[in-house]
From Swiss-Prot:
The modification N-acetylserine is found at S2. Transmembrane segments: none annotated. This is 26S proteasome complex subunit SEM1. Signal peptide: none annotated.
Protein backbone atom coordinates (compact mmCIF):
# COMPACT_ATOMS: atom_id res chain seq x y z
CA UNK A 1 0.00 0.00 0.00
CA UNK A 2 2.84 2.39 0.80
CA UNK A 3 4.30 1.79 -2.66
CA UNK A 4 1.00 2.94 -4.17
CA UNK A 5 1.15 6.12 -2.09
CA UNK A 6 4.78 6.72 -3.04
CA UNK A 7 3.99 6.13 -6.71
CA UNK A 8 1.04 8.54 -6.54
CA UNK A 9 3.22 11.18 -4.88
CA UNK A 10 5.93 10.72 -7.49
CA UNK A 11 3.36 11.00 -10.28
CA UNK A 12 1.91 14.18 -8.78
CA UNK A 13 5.41 15.71 -8.60
CA UNK A 14 5.97 14.83 -12.25
CA UNK A 15 2.63 16.38 -13.18
CA UNK A 16 3.47 19.58 -11.28
CA UNK A 17 6.84 19.78 -12.98
CA UNK A 18 5.22 19.32 -16.40
CA UNK A 19 2.68 22.06 -15.66
CA UNK A 20 5.43 24.45 -14.55
CA UNK A 21 7.45 23.72 -17.69
CA UNK A 22 4.40 24.28 -19.88
CA UNK A 23 3.73 27.63 -18.18
CA UNK A 24 7.35 28.69 -18.69
CA UNK A 25 7.20 27.67 -22.36
CA UNK A 26 3.96 29.60 -22.89
CA UNK A 27 5.42 32.71 -21.27
CA UNK A 28 8.59 32.54 -23.34
CA UNK A 29 6.61 32.11 -26.55
CA UNK A 30 4.39 35.05 -25.72
CA UNK A 31 7.43 37.26 -25.10
CA UNK A 32 8.97 36.27 -28.44
CA UNK A 33 5.94 37.57 -30.33
CA UNK A 34 7.08 41.16 -29.93
CA UNK A 35 9.55 42.54 -32.44
CA UNK A 36 10.91 45.87 -33.48
CA UNK A 37 10.34 47.43 -36.88
CA UNK A 38 13.49 48.92 -38.30
CA UNK A 39 13.44 51.97 -40.56
CA UNK A 40 13.86 51.36 -44.27
CA UNK A 41 17.35 52.19 -45.49
CA UNK A 42 17.51 54.72 -48.27
CA UNK A 43 20.82 54.07 -49.95
CA UNK A 44 21.87 55.27 -53.34
CA UNK A 45 22.07 52.57 -56.02
CA UNK A 46 25.87 52.57 -56.02
CA UNK A 47 26.03 51.82 -52.31
CA UNK A 48 24.02 48.60 -52.29
CA UNK A 49 25.56 45.14 -52.31
CA UNK A 50 23.45 44.10 -55.27
CA UNK A 51 24.73 46.93 -57.44
CA UNK A 52 28.34 46.15 -56.49
CA UNK A 53 27.96 42.41 -57.14
CA UNK A 54 28.95 42.71 -60.79
CA UNK A 55 32.16 44.57 -60.05
CA UNK A 56 32.94 42.25 -57.15
CA UNK A 57 32.56 39.23 -59.43
CA UNK A 58 34.78 40.74 -62.11
CA UNK A 59 37.50 41.50 -59.59
CA UNK A 60 37.40 37.93 -58.34
CA UNK A 61 37.50 36.40 -61.81
CA UNK A 62 40.36 38.59 -62.95
CA UNK A 63 42.53 38.38 -59.85
CA UNK A 64 41.94 35.00 -58.27
CA UNK A 65 45.18 33.50 -59.56
CA UNK A 66 47.42 36.48 -58.75
CA UNK A 67 48.36 35.14 -55.33
CA UNK A 68 51.12 32.58 -55.52
CA UNK A 69 50.13 29.58 -53.47
CA UNK A 70 52.41 26.60 -53.73
CA UNK A 71 50.98 23.78 -51.70
CA UNK A 72 49.94 20.25 -52.68
CA UNK A 73 46.22 20.99 -52.81
CA UNK A 74 46.65 24.04 -55.04
CA UNK A 75 48.95 22.18 -57.40
CA UNK A 76 46.52 19.25 -57.67
CA UNK A 77 43.63 21.64 -58.24
CA UNK A 78 45.47 23.47 -61.03
CA UNK A 79 46.43 20.15 -62.66
CA UNK A 80 42.83 18.96 -62.49
CA UNK A 81 41.61 22.25 -63.99
CA UNK A 82 44.10 21.98 -66.85
CA UNK A 83 43.08 18.36 -67.51
CA UNK A 84 39.40 19.33 -67.48
CA UNK A 85 40.04 22.13 -69.99
CA UNK A 86 41.92 19.74 -72.32
CA UNK A 87 39.17 17.09 -72.16
CA UNK A 88 36.34 19.53 -72.84
CA UNK A 89 37.83 21.38 -75.82
Amino acid sequence: MSTDVAAAQAQSKIDLTKKKNEEINKKSLEEDDEFEDFPIDTWANGETIKSNAVTQTNIWEENWDDVEVDDDFTNELKAELDRYKRENQ
